[in-house]
């Protein structure tokens, strides 16, 4: 901890442990919160850590809920994404009472989603008082340029879940997780971009003082290297209360508060369908025309559109 953000910081101790076995568990604080029989039965498997069911204690993100309670969401692959409350006076963990029915472990906290060593990591929770939802952002895939790294989002009306996607579902240990979660960004290319964005992930998000909402993440490119670059993109909320990432890094753009005339919307659009796959495939745009008569025309799709107040 430190009295100032610039530091210096003083070591106060560990918050949570993972990766131990039956011989090293005594060097952790696990047995301060659960009995040894429970710990060895559940947290240890085949003389090693039970990474299929319990979390990897990395990728922490600390936030405050709508009632100013302090929380830490964490986890990477392994047993999934977990949530623990923190004491705002000390930053130390407030370990909950076990509640197996609601996926609450006395040491690791509330399991939110994932498990089975599925590629879900880098959780970040942001509360939006306008929509009344907590948004849980996670990354799927691996962070190399060929790893299909991408950002998904789930939401909940309560800080401890359930966090669900646009279909009202969430991934558990025994499902194909790529089918779950609203995909915000992955590998994609637009005509004005010199290189495709690759492995876009491990994000945070924030709402600025002017109410604009942003996604912050790192990306690689299809340039034959693993060099990466941070990016900040504005997000807009659709009418169903889901964030939609704008395709270009922010340049201070502002969306009109009063909307747009129909004539301003008519025209040619480059449309990207990112799908739900986790791969090194690059989503390339197709061209669609929004016509003044309300029709949508293109080689890949057709339909209708309308402007609403």
Question: Where is each model-derived feature located?
Answer:
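Carbohydrate-active catalytic/glycan-binding domains of CAZyme proteins
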Residues: 1-309
């Amino acid at each position: 901890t430190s009295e100032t953000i610039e530091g210096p910081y003083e070591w106060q101790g560990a918050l949570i442990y993972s990766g131990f076995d039956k011989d090293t568990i005594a060097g952790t604080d696990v047995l301060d919160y659960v009995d040894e029989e429970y710990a060895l039965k559940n947290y240890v498997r085949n003389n090693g850590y039970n990474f299929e069911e319990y979390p990897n204690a990395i990728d922490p993100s600390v936030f405050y809920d709508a009632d100013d309670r302090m929380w830490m969401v964490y986890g990477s692959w392994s047993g999934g994404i977990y949530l623990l409350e923190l004491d705002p006076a000390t930053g130390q963990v407030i370990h909950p009472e076990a509640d197996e029915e609601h996926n609450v472990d006395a040491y690791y906290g509330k399991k939110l989603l994932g498990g089975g060593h599925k590629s879900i990591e880098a959780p970040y929770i942001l509360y939006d008082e306008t929509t009344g939802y907590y948004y849980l952002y996670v990354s799927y895939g691996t962070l190399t340029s060929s790893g299909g790294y991408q950002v998904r989002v789930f939401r909940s009306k309560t800080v401890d879940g359930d966090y669900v996607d646009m279909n009202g579902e969430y991934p558990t240990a025994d499902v194909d997780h790529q089918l779950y979660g609203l995909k915000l960004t992955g590998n994609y290319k637009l005509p004005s971009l010199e290189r495709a964005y690759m492995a876009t992930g491990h994000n945070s998000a924030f709402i600025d003082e002017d109410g604009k909402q942003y996604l912050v993440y790192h990306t690689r490119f299809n340039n034959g290297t693993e060099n990466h670059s941070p990016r900040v993109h504005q997000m807009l909320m659709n009418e169903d209360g889901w964030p939609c990432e704008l395709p270009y890094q922010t340049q201070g753009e502002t969306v009109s508060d009063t909307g747009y005339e129909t004539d301003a919307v008519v025209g040619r659009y480059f449309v990207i369908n990112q799908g739900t796959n986790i791969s090194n495939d690059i989503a390339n745009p197709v061209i669609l025309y929004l016509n003044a008569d309300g029709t949508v025309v293109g080689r890949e799709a057709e339909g209708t559109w309308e402007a609403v107040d």
